[in-house]
């Protein structure tokens, strides 16, 4: 069993007010009615919290506990002397009350959940200025600095349905490193995630390190799309588009010019495009290489302009007609 200070999550130097605040928080957290899905475990924790509060809230019991431990209260071990127990004898032991009795005595007949607001000083003025949240379903959250560290908490209750969820986040700075601890309490199960400088280091379930849960959480975070800081958009790297080789482009241009030249010859000779002027050109030794020597500006010159430049003169037309 953990020490009473660890159960209430307070230091050994905690004041009586700190003990009360810690019990109020833990008692509401582990109340069996708030943990119907894990009632057996919640009852155990609820009992430990009540026992720790009953001892640490009593000055005399706390002194004996600090000196002898729990054995000094139950009669096990050496135990306190007669003077320390008020002359009750060496066999004297303290009798712990039921956790339900401690809970009723602490909260009284009022709404126990309304007491949770007392833990958050930032809400004290709000409670006096407006109506309190007393409905069956309500949620609230807080965020406040604690010395040089930071912490935030959020709680949600549904008393009728027995649903309870709390999330608390605390950040501390140790030797220049930022340690963030996130505690999630839901249906009697406590999940603790510890991050160091933004990197998840451990995940614990009900106080037990869980490597499987750690691996699943790391995998889930890695699958999330990366977002450019300050931009809010996904980072996309441009991909280079492949272009056709230059010689392929020049061959296409040569082919277009050759076709234009053949058409111009046909029009000049008064023939239809279906004629075989192209074949006659090759028979008269008209080399195709002539077209490649042309200084063509790619797509910046029109095909018709080139065809006009290449149209034969009247003398050439007459000689060709004579040959035909």
UniProtKB/Swiss-Prot annotation:
SMART domains: DnaJ, UIM. InterPro entries: DnaJ_domain, DnaJ_domain_CS, DNJB2/6-like, J_dom_sf, UIM_dom. Residues 3-69 form the J domain. Residues 314-324 have a biased composition (Basic and acidic residues). Residues 322-324 form a propeptide. One of its GO terms (biological process) is negative regulation of cell population proliferation. Residues 70-91, 218-324 are annotated as: Disordered. The modification N-acetylalanine is found at residue 2. Pfam families: DnaJ. Keywords: Acetylation, Chaperone, Cytoplasm, Endoplasmic reticulum, Lipoprotein, Membrane, Methylation, Nucleus, Phosphoprotein, Prenylation, Repeat, Ubl conjugation. This is DnaJ homolog subfamily B member 2. It comes from Mus musculus (Mouse). The gene is Dnajb2.
